[in-house]
């Protein structure tokens, strides 16, 4: 049990830092969602399965969905390869 | 320099406040006595195997109605900001093969899981809010895969309105029997059976359909808005 908590802490810290550091905004969105997944595992270990379910559905699912839609609306929904191609076409 | 100092000062003060509060409380010792009473009483009086549900719908039913009202107001405000629905003719091209195949596979699965979570809300963890979110994602995923085929906003609004009306009507029915508003009616039944806990499953079904229709409408409007808005 303790090592699961430790693993989740490391995973959450790593994904949280990745969400800040990553240049690829799609990757950052996924990283931000996986922080919520770690939190929901911790909630299960703390015997709060209801809260864990909410966290997984809203934090990991709906929030990631909203972030992705916002990225799409701002025109930032692309991977670097596509971006270079588009830049090349513009020249 | 000064702009940085403000938030830092606030964060420091907040941490100090939390520290003072926590230093006074004995660790792991609940201050409130209500929780113990609810744990002892809820299973016998309400009949829901999931104690959380009996708190959310039976002891704190009006809180849940307030939550629904807040969610409704937020969805309405977001819909106002995001603008006009429709205009599917200028839709962007369909998603890639993986997205289309994944949406087809996941749609029935998500519907079943969402309905299961809603209908077993009084027995197992979960309930209307969580299941409603799952239902909403089930209906938005196909829209992402095929932007042309959008479920009608009118149908979603009708489902949402009916579900909200059922919630309030179930609460008001208690008034007819000289109980307080939203008091669970019918007999609690056998603890752990699917048909048990009186009217709580009806309330949770209403909550789930309302939340699902509301969030689905909101997210679909979000996907439509990006097609028409200028960058």
What are the roles of these predicted feature ranges?
Chain B
Residues 1-16, 152-164:
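Alpha-helical transmembrane segments and their helix-start/interface "positive-inside/aromatic belt" motifs
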Residues 40-47, 52-65, 190-205:
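Short aromatic-rich membrane-water interface segments that cap or initiate transmembrane helices
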Residues 70-79, 136-139, 143, 203-218:
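Hydrophobic cores of alpha-helical transmembrane segments in multi-pass inner/ER membrane proteins
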Residues 75-101, 225-231:
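Cytoplasmic juxtamembrane regions at transmembrane-helix boundaries
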């Amino acid at each position: 049990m303790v090592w699961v908590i430790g693993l989740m802490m490391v995973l959450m810290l790593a994904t949280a830092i990745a969400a800040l550091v990553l240049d690829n905004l799609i990757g950052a969105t996924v990283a931000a969602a996986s922080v919520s997944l770690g939190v929901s595992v911790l909630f299960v270990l703390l015997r709060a399965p209801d809260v864990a379910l909410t966290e997984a559905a809203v934090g990991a699912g709906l929030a990631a969905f909203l972030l992705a839609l916002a990225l799409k609306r701002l025109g930032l929904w692309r991977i670097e390869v596509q971006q270079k191609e588009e830049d090349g076409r513009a020249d | 320099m000064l702009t940085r100092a403000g938030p830092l000062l606030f964060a420091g003060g907040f941490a100090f406040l939390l520290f003072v509060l926590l230093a006074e409380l004995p660790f792991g010792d609940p201050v409130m006595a209500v929780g113990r009473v609810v744990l002892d009483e809820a299973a016998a009086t309400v009949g829901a195997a999931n104690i959380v549900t009996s708190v959310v719908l039976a002891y704190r039913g009006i809180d849940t109605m307030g939550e629904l009202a807040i969610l409704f107001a937020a969805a309405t405000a977001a819909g106002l900001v995001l603008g006009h629905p429709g205009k599917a003719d200028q839709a962007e091209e369909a998603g890639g093969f993986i997205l289309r195949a994944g949406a087809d596979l996941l749609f029935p699965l998500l519907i079943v899981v969402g309905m299961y979570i809603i209908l077993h809300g009084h027995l197992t963890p979960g309930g209307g809010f969580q299941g409603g979110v799952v239902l909403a994602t089930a209906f938005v995923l196909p829209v992402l895969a095929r932007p042309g085929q959008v479920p009608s906003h009118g149908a979603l609004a009708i489902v949402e309105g009916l579900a909200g009306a059922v919630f309030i009507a179930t609460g008001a029915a208690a008034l007819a029997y000289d109980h307080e508003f939203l008091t669970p009616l019918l007999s609690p039944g056998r603890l752990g059976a699917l048909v048990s806990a009186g009217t709580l499953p009806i309330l949770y079904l209403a909550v789930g359909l309302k939340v699902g229709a509301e969030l689905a409408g909101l997210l679909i409007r979000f996907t439509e808005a990006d097609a028409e808005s200028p960058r």
